[in-house]
Curated annotation (Swiss-Prot):
It comes from Homo sapiens. The gene is VSX2. It holds the Pfam family OAR. Acts as a transcriptional regulator through binding to DNA at the consensus sequence 5'-[TC]TAATT[AG][AG]-3' upstream of gene promoters. Plays a significant role in the specification and morphogenesis of the sensory retina. May play a role in specification of V2a interneurons during spinal cord development. Mediates differentiation of V2a interneurons by repression of motor neuron gene transcription, via competitively binding to response elements that are activated by the ISL1-LHX3 complex, such as VSX1. Residues 148-207 bind DNA. Gene3D superfamilies: Homeodomain-like. GO terms for cellular component: chromatin; cytoplasm; nucleus. Changing residue 200 to Q: In MCOPCTI; loss of DNA binding capacity at consensus sequences; abnormal and prolonged expression of MITF and WLS; mislocalization of CTNNB1. Residues 1-28, 104-151, 262-300, 313-361 are annotated as: Disordered. Residues 266-290 have a biased composition (Basic and acidic residues). This is Visual system homeobox 2.
Amino acid sequence: MTGKAGEALSKPKSETVAKSTSGGAPARCTGFGIQEILGLNKEPPSSHPRAALDGLAPGHLLAARSVLSPAGVGGMGLLGPGGLPGFYTQPTFLEVLSDPQSVHLQPLGRASGPLDTSQTASSDSEDVSSSDRKMSKSALNQTKKRKKRRHRTIFTSYQLEELEKAFNEAHYPDVYAREMLAMKTELPEDRIQVWFQNRRAKWRKREKCWGRSSVMAEYGLYGAMVRHSIPLPESILKSAKDGIMDSCAPWLLGMHKKSLEAAAESGRKPEGERQALPKLDKMEQDERGPDAQAAISQEELRENSIAVLRAKAQEHSTKVLGTVSGPDSLARSTEKPEEEEAMDEDRPAERLSPPQLEDMA
């Protein structure tokens, strides 16, 4: 009995050792429970109780062998040849299932799916985070490149009133007018220039809405004249002789006249432009009323008084120079007519031809 049982025990042990060595997979250790020792758990058949015994410690191995041996209890072991024949003779399907490659590849293949998805998800999240970082960096660079916005200037009612008055007088004020406005309104000159640009744009927009194309053309011509210091065309000046309202460019002439009046007030009115435009027509005087006529008469009186004062100053200067020069000036004045008479006598003699001289002789 003991020999046969030893052969039966030794045979599956050798087979399991050969299978474990041929498969290349190490023997897996199990617990110390009775079910695990007897192989009653739900693990695959590869975890044979004999293979589990090989992985046990020496003390536990002796105890397990004493239990499994045929002389363990009354000469008959718990596991005899007829007790559990499945542990001694393995069927073909158990041998196929006992292959370590087939056993271990399935869980690895199953686990590879979630691992791949987790890797792709992590890579996608990294790509999204990197793209977000790039976008944030580009947005920061764009904000740095942008210029800082200047605060809008808030004009007071007094400043707006003065600016509107100046705009009604001339849409293109020169440097002198802008400096005077800066002194009045206590604003910088560049702010005044920007205000005039915006006001001109607003005026053009309003005129376009009303459909005044001729006025817009005159406005563009006036702006070019002011920028490039171009005089008024002669055709416009000739048409102004009949009257500003009857001319081909009434708005342009009115603006030009306003600029001339502003220059006259500042004392920089050119003499050529004074004679270029005629005085105001009767129609304009009637439209403006008695107040405008009184203002014009006052301006004329002022100009006349200035001219009279200049004439008196010139007369006084000539008198002073005459008194300072004294008798020298008188001698020069007496010498001049004598020289003129001598020249008159010499001139006909020079002009006479020889036959005329013979006739005279």
